[in-house]
């Protein structure tokens, strides 16, 4: 076997391999012997068919199969010999084959980039320092009550916390536009569902009033014909409702799994859940900064084959979220996912290099802790932990999570980390 390697462009490589004619003939004869032992041909007993008959009937197909097998095996031998690390599937380019002559073919592929981590000491990370206060728990209890609230008619004017039922008709330059009209439209105020100025125009009005509000569509509005346009909406305010919050009764509290039904028990449970969320939010905030710094400090080439593969993964995930199938996933435009796919590949390569250079292995105690932390959010944590422990795929996934955490910690060990006091609400809003 003769091998030559050339760089085509960037991470592209082309390996040219020549297989000696005698190697091909030896492999063909060996395979024909195997075929002769198995085939049945009229007039001959199984395993007793003369070789010339076997060669005449099966020689061409056997030779084709042998060439394909030799191409694959010799390529593997070549990349091992040349210490090449291919990224993605190779593209075989067969040469012309002539019986009795050496056979030359080429294989084109990309290689993984050589990554040398730099600039870790220049990475700056701001770690939030947060405590869950009694006031934070009060706010969360109010949120829980609002989620369970009922609505009752309100005689007064609408404000930011109310719900309204309206008819509206929108127009631009005196002309109604498509999608600008609705009847009995129920709008929960304060959620930012409508364009800027729409809700503000309703505030202060009472049920039964008819009025017109002036708004301007944002420049980034999805409808091209409405971007930046001034519009008028004729409003018929049919109903104004206000929330009626439930009291913290024993019955209400027990809905949240607090068996004794006490306010103190609910506060304890809410605080515990908030602290678990807080721990994850701090971890994610620090991790995202460390990874962002790592990416900025290390500009690397990325094999297009890996990006293609990641795009396919993202397509399938998107299709699954919306109930689509494999065919629909492939029809989703590549450009929707390309930037995210490239980012994920870059992060994977850089963290992989951290893991390699630091010789990291998943810490089983950390894996156990991650599973227990995740399971604590479920009604029966022990059942969840047991389910994970019996599922190899889930355990491997959790080991990968632990290993990634360890890699991020290795980056943080060299980065400039400062602490900043932050409120629970501020941090959680940053995560949203």
UniProtKB/Swiss-Prot annotation:
Q: Does the keyword Transmembrane helix apply?
A: no
Q: Tell me yes or no: is Cell division among this UniProt entry's keywords.
A: yes
Main localization, broad class: cytoplasm
Alphabetized SUPFAM superfamilies for the sequence: FKBP-like, Triger factor/SurA peptide-binding domain-like, Trigger factor ribosome-binding domain
GO MF annotations in UniProt: peptidyl-prolyl cis-trans isomerase activity; protein folding chaperone; ribosome binding
Catalytic reaction annotation: [protein]-peptidylproline (omega=180) = [protein]-peptidylproline (omega=0)
What domain of life does the native source organism fall in? Answer: Bacteria
| All residue ranges annotated as the PPIase FKBP-type domain in the record | 161-246
Return the EC number.
5.2.1.8
Quick one: a GO biological-process term for this protein? protein transport
Q: Which Gene3D superfamilies match?
A: 3.10.50.40, Trigger factor ribosome-binding domain, Trigger factor, C-terminal domain
Residues folding into a coiled coil are: none
Q: Which PROSITE patterns match?
A: FKBP_PPIASE
Instruction: Give the UniProt keywords, A-Z.
Output: Cell cycle, Cell division, Chaperone, Cytoplasm, Isomerase, Rotamase
Q: Provide GO CC annotations from the record.
A: cytoplasm
What are the subcellular locations of this protein? Cytoplasm
Q: Which NCBIfam families match?
A: tig
Family recorded in the similarity comment: Belongs to the FKBP-type PPIase family. Tig subfamily.
What does its UniProt record remark on the domains?
Consists of 3 domains; the N-terminus binds the ribosome, the middle domain has PPIase activity, while the C-terminus has intrinsic chaperone activity on its own.
Q: What is the role of the protein in this entry? A: Involved in protein export. Acts as a chaperone by maintaining the newly synthesized protein in an open conformation. Functions as a peptidyl-prolyl cis-trans isomerase.
Q: Quote the HAMAP family the UniProt record gives.
A: Trigger_factor_Tig
Q: What is this protein called?
A: Trigger factor
Q: Which organism was this protein described from?
A: Citrobacter koseri (strain ATCC BAA-895 / CDC 4225-83 / SGSC4696)
């Amino acid at each position: 076997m003769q091998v030559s390697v050339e760089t085509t462009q960037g991470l592209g490589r082309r390996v040219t391999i020549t297989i000696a004619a005698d190697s091909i003939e030896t492999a063909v004869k060996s395979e024909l012997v195997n075929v002769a032992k198995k085939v049945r041909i009229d007039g001959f007993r199984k395993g007793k068919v003369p070789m010339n008959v076997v060669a005449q009937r099966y020689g061409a197909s056997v030779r084709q199969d042998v060439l394909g097998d030799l191409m694959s095996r010799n390529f593997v031998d070549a990349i091992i010999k040349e210490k090449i690390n291919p990224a993605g599937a190779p593209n075989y380019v067969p040469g012309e084959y002539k019986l009795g002559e050496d056979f030359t073919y080429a294989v084109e592929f990309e290689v993984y980039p050589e990554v040398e981590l730099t600039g870790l000491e220049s990475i700056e990370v701001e770690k939030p320092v947060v405590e869950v206060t009694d006031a934070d728990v009060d706010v969360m209890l109010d949120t829980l009550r609002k989620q369970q609230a009922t609505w009752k008619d309100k005689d007064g004017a609408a404000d930011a916390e109310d719900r309204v039922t309206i008819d509206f008709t929108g127009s631009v330059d005196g002309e109604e536009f498509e999608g600008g009209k609705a009847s009995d439209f129920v709008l929960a105020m304060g959620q930012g569902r409508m364009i800027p100025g729409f809700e503000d125009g309703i505030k202060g009005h009472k049920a039964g009033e008819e009025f017109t509000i002036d708004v301007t569509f944002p420049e980034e509005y999805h409808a091209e014909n409405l971007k930046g346009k001034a519009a008028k909406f004729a409003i018929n305010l049919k109903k104004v409702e206000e929330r009626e919050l439930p009291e913290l009764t024993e019955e209400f509290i027990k809905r949240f799994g607090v068996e004794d039904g006490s306010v103190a028990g609910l506060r304890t449970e809410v605080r515990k859940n908030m602290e678990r969320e807080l721990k994850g939010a701090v971890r994610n905030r620090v991790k995202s900064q460390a990874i962002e710094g790592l990416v900025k400090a290390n500009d690397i080439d990325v094999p297009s084959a890996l990006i293609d593969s990641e795009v396919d993964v993202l397509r399938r995930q998107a299709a699954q979220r919306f109930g689509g199938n494999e065919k629909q996933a492939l029809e989703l435009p590549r450009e929707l996912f390309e930037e995210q796919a490239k980012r994920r590949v870059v992060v994977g390569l850089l963290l992989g290099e951290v893991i390699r250079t630091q010789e990291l292995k998943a810490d089983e105690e950390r894996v156990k802790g991650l599973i227990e932390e995740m399971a604590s959010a479920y009604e029966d944590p022990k059942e969840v932990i047991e389910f994970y422990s019996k599922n190899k795929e889930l355990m491997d996934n959790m080991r990968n999570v632990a290993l990634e955490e360890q890699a991020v910690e290795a980056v943080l060990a060299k980065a400039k980390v400062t602490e900043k006091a932050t409120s629970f609400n501020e941090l959680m809003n940053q995560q949203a």
